[in-house]
């Protein structure tokens, strides 16, 4: 087998219906030097049985049955830590990739040795259709991580990750209040990687994402406000830990601290008033509105346009100073409890001073 070994992590739970199609897609990849690591969560015997034909017929496939529930983040992180390859790819159990997907990404990774991730276009279909090309991250580490903060785009998460960069990250952290979901942990992970290398979009290969209505991110849209608030605050604290450390001076770190808080506390979506009418239109079955629905679907599939009108997407949006104060309080509580961020070492400040200044800027202003 020519070329570096690539580990493909396939975490799965109750995915027996779609899993064989995905595994066959991996088995027939044009790039053959693969280590396909299937991690079956919570002793799910039915999903494990769906893997057996591949385990018997191809030595590149191996499987671990987890005795207890890890959740998607914990299960995915396990495959990252148990990788054998020089590169790693996360593969959702119910998605597929183009036949030369791995080969194309490996070729790009060898061509761009400074890239932490080489990733492909993501084509979503099902409940909605969209083409996502993500946001390439180039330049110096600060420029890359601030661009990552600005857009918070996760398309690159499905790309080819360089093992040497992956080894220098914290992996996928678990939130203590909802470890089976751990909203935003992949975004924190991507920000860590953005400090370690470039994100390169590779033309040609395609990741096919299936939106069947039960996807995790669709379920999050139905969360109650208090859960969205807590998850958003947790992610903000995680991002502070990663982004602020990239500053090259105390002044730059203070500026980056403010930029993170601004990104999470201050809504900036001039097109918000269109959301509810567009959603009602999408649910309508009126024949007279069909041409408009076709136009809306086309607009939603236009990645640059979608990005331009929804650049600052937020899981939880504050609408008044009291909500911002409450969100800010949770962010600081999370930072203190985690113990990974030291305001004295990073910003030559105290928790009390930081909170006072943050409230003055984002609550009292």
Explain the meaning of each model-derived region:
Residues 15-28:
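Short, well-formed alpha-helical segments that are part of the catalytic scaffolds
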Residues 142-223:
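Conserved nucleotide-sugar donor-binding catalytic segment
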Residues 66-83:
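Glycine-rich, basic loop-to-helix element that forms the pyrophosphate-binding segment
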Residues 40-50, 68:
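A conserved acidic beta->alpha catalytic loop
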Residues 88:
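Short aromatic/hydrophobic "clamp" motif used to bind/position activated sugar donors
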Residues 92-96:
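The conserved acidic donor/metal-binding loop of glycosyltransferases
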